[in-house]
Amino acid sequence: MNLSCSLVLLGGGRGERFNSPQPKQYTPLCGEPLILHALHSYQSLPFIQEIVVVCEEHYQELFSPYSVKFASPGALRQDSVFSGLQQVSLPWVCVHDGVRPFVYANEVSEVCSAALKTGAAALATSATYTIKSRTPVRTLDRDAVAVIHTPQCINTEILKEGLLLANMMDFTLSDDSEAAELLGIEPTLVFSNRVQMKITYPEDLLFAEALLSKAHIR
């Protein structure tokens, strides 16, 4: 794959549902802060040429052993992504949530390769639960929907333009690839059959620890 890509690693969320005095992305997982599990995985990928960590200033010291740039988080996730993009110097950017510790090298490569063809791509899994709309309550076809994760790889200028448009519309994005959708670009979904965990509740951390202790995740 002929690609040089930046990583924007999001570490600015507060995580009220996690019920912890510190943001969940800095909670220890098997001996090191949660966010560093993702950072280590991306550092090993040769096409990731630049890493921007979006975090509060008082957490920057945690990343001092690593060659990274910093950006300040915003009020919304999309504000944090846009802040990170101001430090990006490459034409392609991969966005990853700091609360997603499991990063699979082959999947990052597949997502980025797909983005090269269409302008935007996101990691996805098939819906395994019954999904219903709320108003009115209706059962949705599981084969017609997908669960979206990170990484998401997008052309840097497309992502910037989509984020600016969302801000002008006062529109809150659900994920990064939706910024491309606002511009009429259909993101490619790369489906995974592996565990995709976003640490949201304390119980999630216990599950992640069990997985890391018994399997080679990366």
UniProtKB/Swiss-Prot annotation:
Protein function: Catalyzes the formation of 4-diphosphocytidyl-2-C-methyl-D-erythritol from CTP and 2-C-methyl-D-erythritol 4-phosphate (MEP).
Record site feature (Transition state stabilizer), residues: R17, K24
Protein's UniProt name: 2-C-methyl-D-erythritol 4-phosphate cytidylyltransferase
Positions MEP for the nucleophilic attack (site feature) positions: R142, K198
InterPro entries: IspD, IspD/TarI, IspD/TarI_cytidylyltransf_bact, ISPD_synthase_CS, Nucleotide-diphossugar_trans
EC number: 2.7.7.60
Pathway: Isoprenoid biosynthesis; isopentenyl diphosphate biosynthesis via DXP pathway; isopentenyl diphosphate from 1-deoxy-D-xylulose 5-phosphate: step 2/6
NCBIfam families xrefs: ispD
GO molecular function, one term: 2-C-methyl-D-erythritol 4-phosphate cytidylyltransferase activity
CDD domains hit by this protein: CDP-ME_synthetase (cd02516)
Entry superkingdom: Bacteria
Record's keyword terms, sorted: Isoprene biosynthesis, Nucleotidyltransferase, Transferase
Catalyzed reactions per annotation: 2-C-methyl-D-erythritol 4-phosphate + CTP + H(+) = 4-CDP-2-C-methyl-D-erythritol + diphosphate
HAMAP family per UniProt: IspD
Family: Belongs to the IspD/TarI cytidylyltransferase family. IspD subfamily.
Transferase among keywords: yes
PROSITE patterns, per database record: ISPD
Single biological process term from Gene Ontology: isopentenyl diphosphate biosynthetic process, methylerythritol 4-phosphate pathway
